[in-house]
């Protein structure tokens, strides 16, 4: 059994075209044939699959409640938890710079890799099989999730915290965009002033402006120890 056989067992899916899995595991720092296009595809499929599952699971919830629960289930920290369960860091291909910086442990890289694997599965065997695999991954998370304030996304929770303390709201600014139009990486600076323990700028990256802003807000919430 090779190392990718072991990974396939962990994710509960066997590829017909193993090259797709290899590409899904390849970070842009390692090769020109990397996983960002697959990540783009997987992100959309994951959002649809979780949205459909929540729609049927919570027939009395409104659109806002469903959106918040979906955001909780597909956000970067949740995907990073799945990645660690699969031990994706042991299988990823990273450039030397990312390896030195511990990229195989970074939440954003792990989360992107999960989405890329979803995209690869959809190209390999289609949507029906892929959505079932995703449901298998999320079985426990879907069973545990409930509507409520704790499902609000990071930006909303940060804004409400600052408003409650009568502090200035954070400002978000895109400071860099890398890559071609179909696979861009956004770098966002989030500035927070006089928020108790912090008064500084946080920097985060994501495959969209929204993801980068949410990642920056998550950093601040962790700094403030807000669950």
Swiss-Prot record:
Residues noted as binding Mg(2+) in the record, renumbered to the chain: 39, 112, 115
Cellular localisation: Cytoplasm
Catalytic reaction annotation: Endonucleolytic cleavage to 5'-phosphomonoester
Subunit annotation: Homodimer.
Keywords from the named record: Cytoplasm, Endonuclease, Hydrolase, Magnesium, Metal-binding, mRNA processing, Nuclease, RNA-binding, rRNA processing, rRNA-binding, tRNA processing
Active-site feature positions: 43, 115
CDD domains linked: DSRM_RNAse_III_family, RIBOc
Gene: rnc
EC identifiers of the protein: 3.1.26.3
Species, as recorded: Haemophilus influenzae (strain PittGG)
Function: Digests double-stranded RNA. Involved in the processing of primary rRNA transcript to yield the immediate precursors to the large and small rRNAs (23S and 16S). Processes some mRNAs, and tRNAs when they are encoded in the rRNA operon. Processes pre-crRNA and tracrRNA of type II CRISPR loci if present in the organism.
Protein's recorded name: Ribonuclease 3
